[in-house]
Every structure is written in C-alpha cells, then in structure tokens.
Amino acid sequence: MYTAKTAVMQAHSVGMHMSREQIADALIEASEGLIENVYYKSETTLPFKADLHQENGFLRGHDEGNVAVENGLKFHIDWLRGQKTGFFVDQRENRSLLEHYAKGRNVLNMFCYTGGFSVYAMRGGANLVHSVDSSAKAIDLTRANAEMNFPGD
C-alpha cells in the first residue's frame, strides 16, 4: 500500500518507543524512495504506567495528503484522527479475495470504517453493497472512497 509517501508507525511497548527514531530511519531507507514521511501515532497505545507523555506527530517529513492506493483502488485515509493507523493493511488480501466472490451478489460490510471491503466488492461486480458503521465519520469516509473510485455510481 502507498499512502502519500507516508508510513504510519504505532508502538505498543516502551522498547519500540525508545527505538522509534532508528525505526523511522530504517523504514525510509528500506523503502528505496517510496516513503519520505513517518507519522508516529502512539499517544494512546503505549503502556500508561511508563508515563512517557508521547504526543502523535511526524518523526520524519510532513503531511503530504492522505490518499492511499491499493491494488489500483484509492482510499482517503485519516491517520491523524482515524482509528489506529488509519487503514487496516493486514486486510489487503481479504479485500482482494472478496472482490473475486462479489460478482452478482449482495454484500453487507459491517463496521465499514474506510469502506475498503465495499469498494473492492463494487469493483468485483456486486449487485448491491450495504456499508454499516456506528460512526457517521466512517460512513462519510466510505462514501468519499466509493465516489473517488466510481464517480457517479
């Protein structure tokens, strides 16, 4: 996945937090130019007893937009205020798999968040896609992502 040349990093341990600068440098170096910015989003994930008072922010670079491209589909990503790192990249294979099963079917995407599964189902030829989330912000994000990929549909 490509997110506007930005990697979002999240630490869940004090050790990873203490190594964040080296990890950011390694991400940039290993990406061979694909990553220029590293956003650190660990304000709420670090152990509270460690008393680190970490605020979210850029370790390297700056905000260059928030559109990710995955398998030719575009997604608005809100890594600043969104859930976790903003987009669940571990679901990439599952989204792609759904695309192959969607043709001619009705699809219900519960807890849609960015609408990733919905957008893949649409591209896969689903007859109807329902996207459900308790968050109005998530529904707006899903609509925006569907419109960006399928204008006028």
Predicted region positions:
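Non-catalytic substrate-recognition/targeting regions of SAM-dependent transferases
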Residues: 19-88
